[in-house]
């Protein structure tokens, strides 16, 4: 089986593929202080929960936006699975034509998402990833990656609001009954929810206007479904987009 690992700022997502089928996937909190052994025991318990062992892993590929964890996870794969992990970075074949001014600056998660979106949904397209940061990536009709926009994520924004405004309580991020909140909690929910809906609609519209295309808009990330249900500008929600992209890139590097 192929183990795909997406190391994000808030969560690490692991998936197990048999061929092109995602058999299992898990999400755990990112902890920069854990050792290779601690991660090894954690992953062993996840595998064990579905009756699998490390010996069934035949390949590993990693995407990471947390460089301090790269070596830890790489060593974990070597020590417990006897596998040398493929890590997304310079020298890896992605098949993506990157037009970014400084290609090495593009986050590996953005590259992986674009590869998966092109393969499954075609170009042109915009990928919106609701992660620790909310990112927008534009790929033109020739499948060329041009870049996009990076904004503070929902979690970062709401945490700043809770921290800096002493009288405002912590609330659940959910769709409110009305855009006009008639109490503090409802007003906060309206501002957060419709503020992010407006952000997505505004940036997507400006990209479309600037490039003169009608791209497919693909959303991914934990809260993608919540916001996609409120706006017609998002056409597809794919929560496993990054895992799919990792599998595709792994295959492209086996020849």
Curated annotation (Swiss-Prot):
Keyword Nucleotide-binding: yes
GO CC list: cytoplasm
EC number: 2.7.1.33
Chain residues that bind substrate: 100, 107-110, 184
Free-text comment on the cofactor: A monovalent cation. Ammonium or potassium.
Pathway per the UniProt entry: Cofactor biosynthesis; coenzyme A biosynthesis; CoA from (R)-pantothenate: step 1/5
Example GO molecular function: ATP binding
Annotated binding of ATP, by residue: 6-13, 132
Keywords carried by this UniProt record: ATP-binding, Coenzyme A biosynthesis, Cytoplasm, Kinase, Metal-binding, Nucleotide-binding, Potassium, Transferase
Catalytic activity from the UniProt record: (R)-pantothenate + ATP = (R)-4'-phosphopantothenate + ADP + H(+)
Protein's job: Catalyzes the phosphorylation of pantothenate (Pan), the first step in CoA biosynthesis.
Protein name stated in the entry: Type III pantothenate kinase
Provenance organism: Brevibacillus brevis (strain 47 / JCM 6285 / NBRC 100599)
Native organism taxonomy: Bacteria, Bacillati, Bacillota, Bacilli, Bacillales
Gene for this chain: coaX
């Amino acid at each position: 089986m192929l183990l795909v690992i997406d190391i994000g700022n808030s969560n690490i997502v692991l998936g197990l593929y048999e061929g092109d089928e995602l058999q299992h996937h898990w999400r755990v909190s990112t902890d920069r202080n854990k050792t290779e052994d601690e991660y090894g025991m954690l992953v062993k318990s996840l595998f064990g929960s579905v009756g699998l062992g490390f010996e069934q892993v035949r390949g590993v590929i990693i995407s990471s936006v947390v460089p301090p964890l790269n070596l830890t996870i790489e060593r974990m794969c070597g020590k417990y699975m006897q596998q040398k992990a493929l890590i997304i970075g310079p020298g890896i074949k992605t098949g993506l034509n990157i037009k970014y001014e400084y290609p090495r600056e593009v986050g590996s998660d953005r590259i992986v998402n674009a590869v998966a979106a092109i393969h499954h949904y075609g170009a042109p397209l915009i990928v919106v990833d609701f992660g620790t940061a909310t990112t927008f990536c534009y790929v033109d009709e020739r499948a060329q990656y041009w870049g996009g926009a990076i904004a503070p994520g929902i979690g970062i924004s709401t945490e700043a609001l809770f921290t800096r405004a002493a009288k405002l309580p912590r609330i659940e991020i959910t769709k409110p009954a009305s855009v006009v909140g008639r109490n503090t909690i409802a007003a906060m929910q309206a501002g957060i929810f419709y503020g992010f809906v407006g952000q997505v609609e505004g940036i997507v519209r400006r990209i479309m206007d600037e490039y003169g295309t009608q791209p497919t808009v693909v959303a991914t990330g934990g809260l993608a479904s919540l916001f996609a249900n409120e706006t017609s500008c998002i056409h597809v929600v794919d929560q496993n987009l990054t895992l799919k992209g990792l599998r595709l890139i792994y295959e492209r590097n086996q020849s």
